[in-house]
């Protein structure tokens, strides 16, 4: 019997492999699709309850000196500060290698007959680069996306205490850490925001933030 996700109501059960989320975060040399390239790819798959499945993908992609020279001052400082730039120069991983690795992760955990949505924080730019530079990956993902930043903006307007008590981000500007922090943030919103009116107290928000931080702490060590 196939694994299913129960709902406690008289609705059709959903097979677990049909209910995955594919979390992808990219680091690029900039935001211009015509001039800039992907230099780091990280991916994780979660089930419907945000449990991380498997080891995921965390790869630095090689870029030429010419491609790196197209970075503006802000991106140059960011990648230098995070330690990414020397890793890019030393990497022997191609963008195709990284795309293949993410596709293998999806094949392992997801049902290809039911493409999973792309998930992340402010993922429109990531999706644009995926569409342009990793078209096979784009084709393997559902057209729908789960953008945690949309939930953040709603929380800021509808329940400010939830917004202001969210777990603090490390701002490492490295792809895998960014993904785990996005999953953690959505886990927090699930606990504190998607509840009946009048919503949680500030103390409950703080407790929910601590629970979400503890749940994902070992991924960020």
Swiss-Prot record:
GO cellular component terms listed in the entry, alphabetical order: cytoplasm
Free-text function comment from the UniProt entry: 3'-to-5' exoribonuclease specific for small oligoribonucleotides.
Cell location: Cytoplasm
Chief place of localization: cytoplasm
UniProt keyword list: Cytoplasm, Exonuclease, Hydrolase, Nuclease
Species: Corynebacterium efficiens (strain DSM 44549 / YS-314 / AJ 12310 / JCM 11189 / NBRC 100395)
HAMAP family in the record: Oligoribonuclease (MF_00045)
Active site residues according to the UniProt entry: 143
Protein name per Swiss-Prot or TrEMBL: Oligoribonuclease
EC number of this enzyme: 3.1.15.-
Domain Exonuclease: 21-186
CDD domains linked: Orn (cd06135)
PANTHER family given in the database record: OLIGORIBONUCLEASE, MITOCHONDRIAL
Protein family: Belongs to the oligoribonuclease family.
EC supergroup of this enzyme: hydrolase
């Amino acid at each position: 019997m196939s694994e299913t996700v129960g709902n406690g109501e008289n609705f059709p059960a959903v097979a677990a492999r049909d209910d995955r989320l594919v979390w992808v975060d990219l680091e690029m040399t900039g935001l211009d699709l015509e001039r800039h390239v992907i230099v780091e790819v990280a991916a994780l798959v979660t089930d419907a309850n945000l449990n991380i499945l498997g080891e995921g993908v965390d790869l630095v992609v090689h870029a030429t000196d010419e491609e790196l020279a197209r970075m503006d001052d802000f991106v140059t400082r960011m990648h230098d500060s995070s330690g990414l730039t020397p890793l890019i120069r030393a990497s022997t991983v191609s963008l195709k290698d990284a795309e293949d690795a993410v596709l293998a992760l999806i094949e392992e955990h997801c049902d290809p007959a039911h493409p999973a949505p792309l998930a992340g924080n402010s993922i429109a730019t990531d999706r644009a680069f995926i569409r342009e530079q990793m078209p096979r990956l784009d084709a393997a993902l559902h057209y729908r996306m789960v953008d945690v930043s949309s939930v953040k903006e709603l929380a800021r307007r509808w329940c400010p205490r939830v917004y202001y008590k969210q777990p603090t981000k490390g701002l490492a500007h490295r792809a895998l850490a960014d993904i785990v922090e996005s999953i953690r943030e959505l886990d927090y919103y699930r606990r504190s925001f998607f509840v009946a009116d009048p919503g949680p107290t500030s103390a409950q928000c703080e407790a929910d933030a601590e629970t979400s931080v503890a749940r994902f702490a070992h991924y960020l060590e």
